Amino acid sequence: MPASTDSSVNALSVTPKNQQQFAASGVRSLLDKMMPLPSAVKTLVLLFGVGASIGLCGWGALSTAVVDYSQKNELPAPDRNLLIELMLALGGTALLAGLAFLARAQQNAARRLELAAVRLSPLLFIGLLPFLFRWQIWVSRELTLGVFVSAGGIAFHASVRASLRAAEEARAGVESPFRRSVAALLERSASWAPITLVSLGAAAYALFFSYHTVQHHRALLTSSFDMGLEDNLLWNLIHGGPFMKMSPLFGPVGSHFGYHATLFAYFIGPFYALYQHAETLLVFQAVMVALAAYPLYLFAARHVGRWPASLIAVAYVLYPPVHGANLYDFHYPPLGVFFIWMTLYLVDSGRIQWAMISMLLACSVREDMAADTAILGLYLIFSRQARPGAIITAVAGAYFLFVKMVLMPPFLHGDQSFLNQWQGLVGRGSHGYAGVLMTVIGNPVFTLTSLLEPEKFLYLVQLGAPFAFFAWRRPIGYLLSIPGFFFTLLGTKYLPLVQISFQYTAHWTAFLFIAVVSNLERLREARFPGDGEGFLRQRAWLITLCCLSLVCSYQYGAMFQQHTARGGFGPYEFGRSETNARRYDQVHKLIAKVPPRAKIVSSENIVPQVSNRPDSYTLRIGLSDAEYLLFQEPARDDERRFAKSALESDFGVVATEGSFVLAKRGHDKSDNQRVLRRMH
């Protein structure tokens, strides 16, 4: 029989059932021929997942129901079906596109498709973006967000690293003209572009926080503790007052030195003298915190290169714990970060004499920053800078012990300041910080119990999530965590120590970024002969850190949105409403009636407005020898009794403006009853 006849007979014998069998066997044959089954499954799953994730991202970006859907799982059935159909459709489209590419059976098509799928794998996470960049979803769910971001960040890093490795293999050592052009551009601009990026970030930070903290102050939202305290100390310092006088806390007699050795105030004095108001300190703080980006960049550039260093410096200005500390009035620890990093850079670059000056300035910021500087010396010892590291540890450690244990207690009649923050670790029969150390060393079970508190777990998550805990990848990270561990985590029942809205985060910020730089540098080292992936490992972590910094800064920080940031004890109020502006004008009309050097006692939020004088007292502590009384109605419970007592004795109402009352000792009391009736 002719061959053509045989073909016709065979064709006629094909049934629909046989067609399905032939198609299935053809697909299996195609897959078996082109790639092993595990690789085929991985490739097709990745393609489907990327398509589905893009669908989820598109729906999330356009839908107005994302918040309710995330928080309550509430979504109308048609919308829910649309979401699933969209994800399946785009996932299926990506899958079919991959199969179509395979069917063409070009040379190395299977491997090329597999590499393409791996290169696209970071897009698996794109579907999360609409959820991560909606702050409403995560209100009161900070721990959930932190754990989610940390775990997702680790997975994202794995996908980025695999993607970079696949890209290298796909190029097979051949650089495209575009990549060569980009590489040449980055190299040509490396002398100026990275430092420009750092400068823009630092300038944006300084301007943003200067403006908003000043506005916050002018909305009467700063407090006697601690804005008024620090403003009064600086005013007395530049006017030749008693050593470290702080009248809002101690009254007419008393020195702040017993609580904190902030000798750095003498450095701030000349700047404060230019404009003797609390606003000067707020601007100074914002600028100093921003300037710390420069020594961090300079140090990092020596170890990981200029471009990566610029990204690390920008991550610093976006770091939420930095924002929280800056938003809470004015404090010294955030200022110390600049000098710790400057000391590190100067030692690292061989400028030892300048490093010693920077070290002394770091110690002068506050006594606890001297302890931090001593730990910096230990890091230098382990970083092959043994001699300068040993000097720094010895000098800074001796300074801390001498100032804290010898010089400061006499100013508090022999007591040790802030021991109450660790009081739970002082055993019966023990006393002072020696008792704390005895418990930490001799009773690890009790110490561990005090550490395992929900607030501390959340605190660590918020500190580490922007890095996916990368800072603790190597033992050096734990050495650098000693200051934060002692000054925050060991605290007992004092919540400000373990909240990112207080100044104590500086003990972590100063060292976690050093650990990040150290770990990134180590990633470049070959792990075995012929290991050429060090650059890929470093780049993968850099990309991960940048992405996580953006997410966490948006959620916890202050610069991208102003709904969730906290400063001090509560949510931070940005801007100045018309009501607050009017209240500011009213209180300053009354302040204008008070002589510049008259002794005045005021409500908590008014003290910072009048603390630039020799004696400005806090009403909730007492009247002391004040000549004037300035308070707001309705008065706080801890202020009302003193204000009422004053008006019932020898203070007379001078004037009222809105809810504010000004009274003077010995003044006519004819208006007192009107005010007293409102106070009952």
Name what the model sees in each region:
Residues 2-17, 21-52, 90-95, 106-126, ...:
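Start-transfer (signal-anchor) and selected internal transmembrane alpha helices
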Residues 181-186, 372-398:
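Perimembrane helix-loop-helix junctions
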Residues 208, 212, 386-473, 477-482, ...:
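Membrane-lumen/periplasm interface segments of specific transmembrane helices
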Residues 119-126, 196-202, 393-397, 523-561:
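Signature aromatic-anchored transmembrane alpha helix within multi-pass, membrane-resident enzymes
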Residues 295-298, 315, 326, 334-359:
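Specific aromatic-rich, kink-prone transmembrane helix
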Residues 312, 341-346, 353-367, 372-381:
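Membrane-interface alpha helices of multi-pass inner-membrane proteins
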Residues 95-105, 279-303:
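Transmembrane-helix motifs of polytopic, lipid-linked glycan transferases
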Residues 82-84, 140-151, 478-531:
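Hydrophobic/aromatic-rich transmembrane helices and adjacent perimembrane loops
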